[in-house]
Regions:
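Non-heme Fe(II)/2-oxoglutarate
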Residues: 1-62, 77
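Catalytic core of non-heme Fe(II) oxygenases with the double-stranded beta-helix
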Residues: 60-177
Length: 177
């Protein structure tokens, strides 16, 4: 995964305006998403410059999927999963806004254990889980940043205890060859 600044502040505010214009769709469960407000922009809205900046970043991937907003509020979370659909090649999560009182809601990844050698001065019990996804990682994001990853990343979102966290999810197809 990597963190990038894909959109500028004006585009971020444009995305917030689009989100606020959309009807709230409260989901108790939407596959891996729990207790979120999910909103889909129209095809016309998806043609705005704020979306085009993200689409341009992913221009080497098939433009087969749409964007959607997720607002994480109290008790919201996303369970650990991979986007293992064969058609999904790239995911971009853009952090649009958060409340000042936000507790929880962190982007999470489960990374592979990569240490090949074991220190001689430390004891061990059990086999080394080399290349297994066993390392939990909190991905600290700033408002305006985008988290970019492919379908192999095991990821989730920590449960929100207080406040809210608003993101734009952008899915793209496989790399254009």
């Amino acid at each position: 995964y990597k963190l990038e600044n894909i959109i500028n502040e004006e585009q971020r505010h444009q995305l917030l305006d689009v989100y606020n214009s959309l009807k709230s769709e409260l989901a108790h469960q939407d596959y891996n998403l729990f207790d979120v407000d999910k909103r889909h922009p129209s095809k016309e809205q998806a043609q705005l410059d704020c979306f085009k900046a993200i689409d341009q970043y992913a221009s080497n991937h098939e433009q087969t999927f749409r964007h959607y907003f997720l607002n994480y509020t109290e008790d919201s979370f996303t369970k650990f999963h991979t986007d293992n659909d064969d058609a999904v090649g790239l995911t971009i999560v853009t952090f649009l806004d958060r409340s000042d009182n936000l507790i929880g809601g962190e982007a999470l990844a489960m990374l592979p254990y990569t240490k090949r050698s074991r220190p001689a001065n430390k004891y061990r019990k059990g086999e080394a889980p080399i290349d297994e996804r066993v390392v939990p990682k909190v991905i600290n994001m700033e408002v305006g940043q985008s988290l970019i990853y492919d379908k192999s990343l095991m990821h989730g979102v920590g449960q929100v205890e207080r406040g809210n966290r608003l993101v734009l999810i952008s899915w793209y197809g496989n790399t254009i060859s």
